[in-house]
Amino acid sequence: GLELEEAFTKSREKGYIDTVTKVGQAPKIYRFDNRSSAARKFIQTQNEHLVKNTCFICATDRLALGINQGLQSIGVEVPADFGIIGYDGVFLDQVSSPKLTTMKQAIVEMGEACGELLIQKIEHNDTSQRQQRFLPQLVVRESTR
């Protein structure tokens, strides 16, 4: 998880807890600043307590990248020993080795909707507020099996 009190962090955490609980598992949450170095250090300091065949479900791709770096630094294999799933899918998921499985946000669709809303507000002097929900998509790559 992230050490932020923001709506998106709470939403991601709730989704994780609900899903893990639904399949009969107990959720484990560790909160970090959104820095890969914090996640890497966590792995390096928790080395003796890590249970193989665990999948790290990370609040961001940046944290997932740090988990990956930490696991590689202690000599374990991803995805053979541990799985990693990130969240965002905007760049970092593609630069890691192995490439990260991620929950990809609909960034293009968000931008298009934002532009359309802005044009509508300008053309029609529209001051109303609206919310739109965009669902992420699971993109399976090399960090899970």
Indicate residue ranges for each PLM-predicted region.
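Flexible loop/turn connectors
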Residues: 27-28, 40-145
